[in-house]
């Protein structure tokens, strides 16, 4: 789906979904003892009831992050990625000016300044400031880039609208001049977004500027000949584009890792900040650089159907800052997150509920104490995968919610507390609404985990505040950016409660591995439904949009896949291309259920002790074509024998229509 609307902002410069506000994180007033009842030993819990306690804690409530700044930056990042995903590949040249106009409205809107928001976002995330001289210079450069890019887009629009026989030499010279000015301005301005000591702080700014530069450079390949550029000039632009794609990608990944590693710590609070940086830089930087290779129109000569399979984590559902010292440790949370695995889909959650008694029977509530998760592998397997148990098992009735076939695009979780005269406070999640969408039936519905017993209402956490929609021009069930994929619980120290948190994946993930009849279809290798014992899934390097397959020994069947094709796609034949990195030359093969057998030769791209960088990945293409019959649309990837110490990484498989 092509989304041209961008993000509509309300008069307060907030997304309209922002009006669905959650109660801010609460913390105890600094002029009170940490435990309010201890301030006045003559107070009783009856005198200091729940509402009074909540009023006291709300007097000094603060949001850890400025939600307006963060949501504006994250929302812009999500919107830009969503727009580009809908149009990547050469066919979008036909609607290029309308895309550019929508794109310009996203990154340079008339009623907001996303670039300032990008800078402020990282300042908050890592608690550092950009020096005023560096910020002012960067903003001035961005203003110049906007002017140049808008002039070029207007000229391109006029050029494309003019009949070919009415295009003059003067107009040809003019658009070449404006293209060259804009391109050179980007090239000369990029160092202003990579100022020494501020590389991490400028990271989203750098990524967005780099993306715009590469989008622009692509046009030399699409229009260069009709603009009157020589073949040598066009080739020079192409080589520059390839070089800068590598340079920009490596810069973003390197400084993302520097920033992330600087936030590693030992406490619960440190993990929350670490994870926020990881999530928001994924949405504004890493998701964007995944798209850079698609601007190579010689490699992607058709439209592209692709998907982002990476996981991101919303904040733990925990709204009381006074209890942060009782949260799980940094390492216990990070180590409990699922290790890299084949992609799977949320099938259901089994909730366990426990009673949290209040003082003298008052202020008692039930809470989400633990859970199992059921998932299913990618299409091709009917297995159900049951997770380990997370949290505390219960003696209360168990509640199961089934999401099979539904896409959960929003969660709203309510929380509660119980306070005791000795100052102890206990926390729990009492209710969660899961908004879901069945895109096959075009139906929306809501399922609810309900503990059935509440004390009051401390606050709520709405996933939309952290994962805004791609656009506000459509209903949320159509415009959502992410879908729920997993749920875990962590036990608080001193038995103070349980903290759940959710894992999400991008909306572009295709449940059915659908092969397009006209576009190049990218199938991430993690969408296989089975692996051989000689293969495993490892963490991706940051620029692939997901994890990788690591091959440690040869096998006739490294990975098994099932795909879906409509009648037009079944009539098509496809050349197969694999994106990989390898320390050795090797012969791979692809065989489908029609017994089409394709051989793919891969060459060494890296040394045995080398790191995975953009340059270490290459493409290898099959020596012939394959088709599918429609009866059983399965295929396997295999590999001939190789020395066991060698390393082979596979990122994606591409099906390129040839008819």
From Swiss-Prot:
Domain of life per record: Bacteria
SUPFAM superfamilies (alphabetical): delta-Endotoxin (insectocide), middle domain, delta-Endotoxin (insectocide), N-terminal domain, Galactose-binding domain-like
InterPro entries documented for this protein: Galactose-bd-like_sf (IPR008979), Pest_crys (IPR038979), Pest_crys_dom-III (IPR005638), Pest_crys_dom_I (IPR005639), Pest_crys_N_sf (IPR036716), Pest_cryst_cen_dom_sf (IPR036399), Pest_cryst_dom_II (IPR001178)
Query: GO molecular-function annotation terms?
Result: signaling receptor binding; toxin activity
Q: What Pfam families does this protein map onto?
A: Endotoxin_C, Endotoxin_M, Endotoxin_N
GO biological process: one example: symbiont-mediated killing of host cell
Function according to Swiss-Prot or TrEMBL: Promotes colloidosmotic lysis by binding to the midgut epithelial cells of Coleoptera.
Please give the name of this protein.
Pesticidal crystal protein Cry3Ba
Q: Which organism is it from?
A: Bacillus thuringiensis subsp. tolworthi
């Amino acid at each position: 789906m092509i989304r041209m609307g961008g993000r509509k902002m309300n008069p307060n410069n907030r997304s309209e979904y922002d009006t669905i506000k959650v109660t801010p994180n609460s913390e105890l007033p600094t002029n009170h003892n940490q435990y309010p009842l201890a301030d006045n030993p003559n107070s009783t819990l009856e005198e200091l009831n729940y509402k009074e306690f909540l009023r006291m804690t709300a007097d000094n409530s603060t949001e850890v992050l400025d939600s307006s700044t963060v949501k504006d930056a994250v929302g812009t990042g999500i919107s830009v990625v969503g727009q580009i995903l809908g149009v990547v590949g050469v066919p979008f040249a036909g609607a290029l000016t309308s895309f550019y106009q929508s794109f310009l409205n996203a990154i340079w809107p008339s009623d907001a300044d996303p670039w300032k928001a990008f800078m402020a976002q990282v300042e908050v995330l890592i608690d550092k400031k950009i020096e005023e001289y560096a910020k002012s210079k960067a903003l001035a450069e961005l203003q110049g880039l906007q002017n140049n890019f808008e002039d070029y887009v207007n000229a391109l629009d006029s050029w494309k609208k003019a009949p070919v026989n009415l295009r003059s030499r003067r107009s040809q010279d003019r658009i070449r001049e404006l293209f060259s000015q804009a391109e050179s301005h980007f090239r000369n301005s990029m160092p202003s977004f990579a100022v020494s000591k501020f590389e991490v702080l400028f990271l989203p700014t750098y990524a967005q500027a780099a993306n715009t530069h590469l989008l622009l450079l692509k046009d030399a390949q699409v229009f260069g000949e009709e603009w009157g550029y020589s073949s040598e000039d066009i080739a020079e632009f192409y080589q520059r584009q390839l070089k800068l794609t590598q340079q920009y990608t490596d810069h973003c990944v390197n400084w993302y890792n520097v920033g992330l590693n600087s936030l590693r710590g030992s406490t619960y609070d440190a993990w929350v900040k670490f994870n926020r940086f990881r999530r928001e830089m994924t949405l504004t930087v890493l998701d964007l650089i995944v798209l850079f290779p698609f601007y190579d129109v010689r490699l992607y000569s058709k439209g592209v159907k692709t998907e982002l399979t990476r996981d991101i984590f919303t904040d733990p559902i925990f709204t009381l800052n006074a209890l942060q010292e009782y949260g799980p440790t940094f390492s216990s949370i990070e180590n409990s997150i699922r290790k890299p695995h084949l992609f799977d889909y949320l099938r259901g959650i089994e909730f366990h509920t426990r009673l949290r008694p209040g003082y003298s029977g008052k202020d008692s509530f039930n809470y989400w104490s633990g859970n199992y998760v059921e998932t299913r592998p990618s299409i091709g397997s009917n297995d159900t995968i049951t997770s380990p148990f997370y949290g505390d098992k219960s003696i209360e009735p168990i509640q199961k919610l089934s999401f099979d076939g539904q896409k959960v695009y929003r969660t709203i979780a309510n929380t509660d507390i119980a306070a005791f005269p000795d100052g102890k406070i206990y926390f729990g999640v009492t209710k969660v609404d899961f908004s879901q969408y069945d895109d096959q039936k075009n139906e929306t519905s809501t399922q609810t985990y309900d503990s059935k017993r509440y004390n009051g209402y401390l606050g709520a956490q709405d996933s939309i505040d952290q994962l805004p929609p791609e656009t506000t021009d459509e209903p949320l069930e159509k415009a959502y950016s992410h879908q729920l994929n997993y749920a875990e619980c962590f036990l608080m120290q001193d038995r103070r409660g349980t903290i759940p948190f959710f894992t999400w994946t991008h909306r572009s993930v295709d449940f059915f591995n659908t092969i397009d009849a006209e576009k190049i279809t990218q199938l991430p290798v993690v969408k296989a439904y089975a692996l051989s014992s000689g293969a495993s899934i490892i963490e991706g390097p940051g620029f692939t949009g997901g994890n990788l397959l690591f091959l440690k020994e040869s096998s006739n069947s490294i990975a098994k896949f099932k795909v879906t094709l409509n009648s037009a796609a079944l009539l098509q034949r496809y050349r197969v291309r694999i994106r990989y990195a390898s320390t050795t030359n090797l012969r791979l093969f692809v065989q489908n259920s029609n017994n089409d057998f394709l051989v793919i030769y891969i060459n060494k791209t890296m040394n045995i002790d080398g790191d995975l960088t953009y340059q270490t990945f290459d493409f290898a293409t099959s020596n012939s074509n394959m088709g599918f019959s429609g009866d059983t649309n399965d295929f396997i990837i295999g590999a001939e024998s190789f020395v066991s110490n060698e390393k082979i990484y596979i990122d994606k498989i591409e099906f390129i229509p040839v008819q």
